Regions:
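ATP-binding N-terminal substructure of ATP-dependent carboxylate-amine bond-forming enzymes
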Residues: 1-68, 72-74, 78-85, 96-110
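Phosphate/pyrophosphate-binding betaalpha-module
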Residues: 89-96, 122
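Basic phosphate/pyrophosphate-binding loop/patch that engages nucleotide-derived ligands
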Residues: 82-90, 147, 166
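Hydrophobic beta-strand scaffold residues
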Residues: 61-62, 90, 119, 155
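Structured loop/turn residues at beta-strand edges in well-structured enzyme cores
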Residues: 32, 88, 115
Length: 172
């Protein structure tokens, strides 16, 4: 919603409605014009490309990555595969589905033993670090898997890497 005179409009009743024809946001019958959207959301519908796709369809500009890049980045296992194919160094790890875990948890546990400790167990499509657990001992792996699987049916298990996190914006 747009800030007008330092205050946000009050939203009552139904949710606000974005109008393709008027390039605006209708709140209680009042049309607020939109210059650009700053999608400051995490997780599903915010980082997964859905909002970006919707905004693309109605022609409203926004700040940040496009729909396809957002969708790819939301799935950690897919993003990791994409980066590896592009020749970018990635942390050693495996992807485990819920079906694999339920079918043979011991084989999965055996396969991660070579990764070394500590490691991270992450819901592949979890946002805001939900479903992410740092595992320091193999005995904690099963509970970490259950935690991650409570957020997604696909889990990424990676060896922890010490390093600096670097972020940068790219302007087209």
């Amino acid at each position: 919603l747009a800030i007008n005179d330092g205050t946000l409009p009050s939203v009552t009743g139904n949710f606000p409605e974005v109008s393709r024809e008027n390039r605006g946001l209708s709140v209680d019958g009042n049309l607020l014009s939109i210059d650009v959207i700053f999608p400051v959301l995490h997780g599903t519908y915010g980082e997964d490309g859905q909002l970006q796709s919707d905004l693309d369809q109605i022609g409203i500009p926004y700040v940040g990555s496009g729909a396809v890049a957002s969708e790819l980045a939301m799935d950690k296992a897919e993003a990791k595969s994409f980066f590896a194919k592009a020749g970018i160094a990635i942390a050693p790890g495996i992807t485990v589905t819920e079906a694999q875990w339920k079918r043979d948890a011991q084989s999965v546990t055996d396969s991660i033993a070579n990764l070394g400790m500590p490691l991270f167990v992450k819901a592949s499509r979890g946002g805001s670090s939900r479903g992410t657990v740092k595992v320091k001992e193999l005995s904690a792996f099963a509970s970490a898997m259950e935690e991650a699987l409570s957020f997604d049916s696909k889990v990424l298990v990676e060896r922890a890497i010490d390093g600096a996190e670097v972020e940068c914006a790219v302007l087209e």
